[in-house]
Amino acid sequence: MRKLGFIILCLCTAWTAFGQSKLDLQSQMMLLQIRNTAIPTYNSRTRSFERPREVQQNVMAMVEFMGQNALDELDAQGAKVLRVRGDIAIVMMPTADVECIAELKCVRRLELSRPVYQKMDIVRKTIGIDKIHQGIDLPQAYTGKGVVTGIVDGGIDPNHINFLKPDGTTRFGYISKITATTTTQQGYLYQNYYPRAVLDTMKQQDNTYAIEDFATDSYTNFHGTHTSGIMAGGYKGNILAAKTDDQNLSYNVTVPNLYYGGATESEIVASCGDLRDQFIAFGVDDIINYSKLSGPKRKPCVINLSLGSNLGAHDPNSVMNRFLSLCGEDAIICVAAGNEADNTVALTAKFDKADSTVQTFVRPMIEGEYKTAKKTYYNLRNGQICAYSNDADEFELQIVVTNSARKNKVAVRIPVAENTNGQPVIYSSGGDYAINGAVVNSTFAKAFEGYVSAASIKDPETGRYYVLAQFLTSDNQTTNKDGNYKLGLLIKSKKAGQRVDVYGDAQFVYFDDYAQEGWTKGSRNGSISDMACANNVISVGSYNVRNHWPSLDGYVYGYNKQGEGNDFPVGEASRFSSFGTLADGRNLPDICAPGASVISSVNTFCVTNPDMGYTSAALQAKFEKGGKAYYWHQSLGTSMATPVVAGAIALWLEADPTLTYKDVVRIIRQTAVKDEYVKNTGDPVQWGAGKFDAYAGLKQVLLEKGANGIQGVKTEQREMPVLTMTGSRSFTAFLAKAKQMNVRAYTLSGQLVHSQVAQGNEININASSWEKGVYLIQVNGSPAQRIIIY
């Protein structure tokens, strides 16, 4: 009877679907898109716009719930609970019942899943990981032993040699694969993979397989293998690598692998499949559960998320960001800042008085023709735009079509004058874009083929008023071939002191003024990924360490175009690296790490896929063994910078497994390098605290927590000093917990040649007057260590 009553309730309230205040606006617009097969969506795999053949029967959602019986009530109403963290549940529910489930008394907020996008030789040396691996003047070498390095990504090849132990067994402890599908009643497929040796000890379970039999989750994507390799790749055997002596031509040599990662002996855990935010949350939860339950005691864990989206409130209070924040209490989570700062994909309007107006154009990233498999578009504008007030107060937003031939006079106005409670206003050109409930406007059709929709609501997630616009337009080649008709936004304040933050999804459009008077250009500040705005996560930007590389085809390539200057100056912040000043006052990212460009392992199945068109020009190294070829190549992005930090944090966690997010982020900021590039180039917000320094961070960990590793081993009862050569005739000495440094240098015959005392735990020694040779260095009476002065 209860379920029957629920169905009757759904039928009675379906007509008010857009008035549900517990369902965020983006989810409401997503439901409109799912249920209306006339609306085309972009398929990134086929690189075309496609209309769904049928309505999706089930959807995944996050529910923020309340009450002791909430989970039972959700289950009783057809929402299958998959995961729970705090007061947030990941559920699968029928598409037809979303609004009704949102109205249950036990539901505080409900959010549907939304797409996110994937966003080391020089690197290791630059941030000091090589020193840590070698244990140079450290109590011991740190390689991530006993630490779980987790990753959620796509394009993972877990049997790449970079992830195998020297005996050929896998370093992966567990992989989960989550994909949406119409072939199961649940609407998704959840598969689990374990090492065969572990699987053989388990009872037979459905959808559980051996990691050794896993090929890849994607034959068209290398990303996850690349990021995993940066974070935790450990193969150090021989490879065939390209080398150059003149930055023009290259030659191939067999050398020990240069391109292994940070936590070379860590235990790797991954989640892959469809890249939607709630599938990602599912994967993060899987990794944390593994770190808690896979051994006799909990293992320290760091998780890399080289994923994100620029859409969203950029607020820590969204359901997804609250979930990540809760996960950040159980693992150190590193999130990519994003790669959208190349374009002005954000805009912040601050109004001194009421009835003030800011206007901007929605400009296509690809101007002119854009060919897909099925259709050619002209000045394609596609995607979503969110505009948020700084509080619950409304503002007025109009989507306009202007005519530059008539001094940008407005030809069509699509107004969102006040709160529509989620009810969309839709304008369409008709024809192929005939949408139920849309206004077919002849002037709009003269300008574009396509549609524009917009709706507004007081956001149940953040309490802020906002407008969401969704659109797909292509210039009409009969009546707008010259592109005079353009799409724009007009934002009008309703009170003094109002702030409106506008974010594009950074896929096909950005905000520009076309050099027109009275119009406003967008900003790079605000390009930060929404997921990076969660509390208890470390957001990572990118700086440049390489702008050219030798390839296996005999040539050297780079990103810099001949005669056009240096696009990626070594040492500077990468121009694409996203950043933002949020409405709550925070500046992100937290830190920058090497991300342009980084050479790492890549998915063999992607490289060998004929449709991908790989040649030796795209590859920097390869190795063949047992009939399988393995490859390495360069890539760039905050996706690459983030696992640099995650891998280094695994080394810190080996040194001190008790480190928390607050410890790690404080040490990152405290030990960041602020060199001349940080001080004098780029936007200060884009740099965060500066450049990440893994070695200085580890020294600080040792200083605060001592040199205890996971196994509780100390090389000496007494703390050992750290000696670091800073030149051929100079070095520093560091001793954790020391208040005064007393350094003595002796020849091998025992003659004292130098004595120096300083306050603190670190001292600089100038050996320029010493004879060449080997010296014994004693710090505070510790056992002597050898150094060589050249």
Task: List PLM regions with ranges.
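Subtilisin-like serine protease catalytic core
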Residues: 136-279, 296-299, 328-330, 341-345, ...
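C-terminal tail/sorting-segment detector
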Residues: 772-790
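N-terminal domain-start motif of subtilase-like serine proteases
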Residues: 28-55, 97, 118-168, 205-222, ...
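Catalytic-core environment of secreted peptidases
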Residues: 184-212, 404-405, 439-440, 452, ...
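Substrate-binding/access-modulating region of protease and related hydrolase catalytic domains
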Residues: 272-351, 371, 379-396, 402-411, ...
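C-terminal subdomain of the subtilisin-like protease fold in secreted/lumenal serine endopeptidases
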Residues: 47-51, 251, 291-294, 300-309, ...
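Hydrolase catalytic cores
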Residues: 228, 236, 240-248, 269-273, ...
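Autoinhibitory N-terminal propeptides
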Residues: 5-8, 17-139, 148
